[in-house]
C-alpha cells in the first residue's frame, strides 16, 4: 500500500482507501462521485493549535466530504482523491464545532444538509495493542471481551460504514451495514470489489499527475508548470 502511485504522489493510506471505495461503489452505481463521512482520531491538530502529545485518547472528528473522479483514469484516482482531500480546511476538524457550537445560521445550514449514507474510518496502525499499557481495556477487533460498542436500539447512522485498520502489518476492513437495505450477498460482492480495487491501485506503477504541494502557497497547476519551465 506504500508503493506505486500512492508513494509516488506522497499520498496517505486514507487516500488509497478512499480512492478504492469510490471505484468499488462507482462500479455498482455508475456514478464517479463519492459522498462520504470521514472519521478521524483528531490527534493531528490543525495549523495554529497545540499538539496533543501530552494528552490521552482520541478527539474524534467527523465531517462530510465529496470526491469527484469524473474523467479521472484509474491510475490517477489516488492523486485526485488526495488533491481533493487536501482542499478540506483543517482536515475537517472545524466541522463539528460549527455544526454544534457555531452561530445560528451556520448550525442551521449544516443541519439542513444531507448526511452521507456511507462513512469511512481509517483507524491507523494498531500493531502491538495487546502489549500496550491499556491492554486490559481489550480494545481489539474480534476480542471476545470487547463487548458491544453501541446500544442495540441505537439507530444506524449510515447505510454502510467501512472501518479500516492495520493490525500487525495486515489490513483489516470491516463492513457495518443496514440489514434492512442490503443483504449479506450484496455486501460480500462490494467487499470483493473493494479489495480488488485496493490491490489494483497498490500495484499500479504508472505515475499519476502530481498533486498540489503540501504548502500554504496560492499556486495553481499552471503556476507550478511555469516555475518548473523557468528553471
Predicted regions: what they are:
Residues 207-231:
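Short, charged, surface-exposed hinge/linker loops at domain edges
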Residues 4-18, 28-147, 179-180:
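His-Asp-centered acyl/peptidyl-transfer active-site segments
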Residues 23-24, 90, 205:
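The DNA-recognition helices of helix-turn-helix-type DNA-binding domains
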Residues 32-39, 74, 96, 151-216:
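Extended, hydrophobic beta-loop-alpha segments that form or line the acyl/peptidyl-thioester binding
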Residues 20, 80, 189-193:
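A non-catalytic, amphipathic alpha-helix used as a structural packing/dimerization or gating element
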Residues 26, 53, 110, 152-154, ...:
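Generic marker of residues within folded, mature protein domains
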Amino acid at each position: 500500500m506504500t508503493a506505486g502511485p500512492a508513494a509516488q504522489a506522497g499520498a496517505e493510506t486514507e487516500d488509497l482507501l478512499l480512492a478504492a471505495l469510490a471505484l468499488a461503489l462507482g462500479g455498482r452505481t455508475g456514478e464517479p462521485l463519492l459522498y462520504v463521512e470521514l472519521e478521524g482520531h483528531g490527534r493531528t491538530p490543525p495549523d495554529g493549535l497545540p499538539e496533543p502529545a501530552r494528552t490521552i485518547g482520541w478527539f474524534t472528528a467527523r465531517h462530510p466530504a465529496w470526491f469527484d473522479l469524473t474523467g479521472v483514469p484509474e491510475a490517477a484516482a489516488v492523486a485526485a482523491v488526495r488533491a481533493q482531500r487536501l482542499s478540506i480546511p483543517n482536515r475537517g476538524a472545524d466541522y463539528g464545532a460549527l455544526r454544534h457550537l457555531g452561530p445560528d445560521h451556520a448550525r442551521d445550514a449544516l443541519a439542513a444538509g444531507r448526511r452521507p449514507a456511507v462513512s469511512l474510518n481509517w483507524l491507523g496502525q494498531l500493531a502491538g495493542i495487546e502489549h500496550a499499557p491499556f491492554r486490559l481495556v481489550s480494545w481489539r477487533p474480534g476480542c471476545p471481551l470487547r463487548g458491544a460498542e453501541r446500544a442495540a436500539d441505537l439507530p444506524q447512522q449510515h447505510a454502510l460504514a467501512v472501518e479500516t485498520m492495520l493490525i500487525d502489518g495486515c489490513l483489516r476492513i470491516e463492513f457495518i451495514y443496514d440489514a434492512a437495505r442490503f443483504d449479506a450477498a450484496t455486501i460480500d460482492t462490494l467487499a470483493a470489489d473493494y479489495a480488488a480495487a485496493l490491490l489494483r491501485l497498490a500495484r499500479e506503477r504508472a505515475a499519476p499527475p502530481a498533486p498540489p504541494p503540501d504548502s500554504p502557497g496560492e499556486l495553481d497547476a499552471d503556476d507550478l508548470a511555469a516555475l518548473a519551465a523557468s528553471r
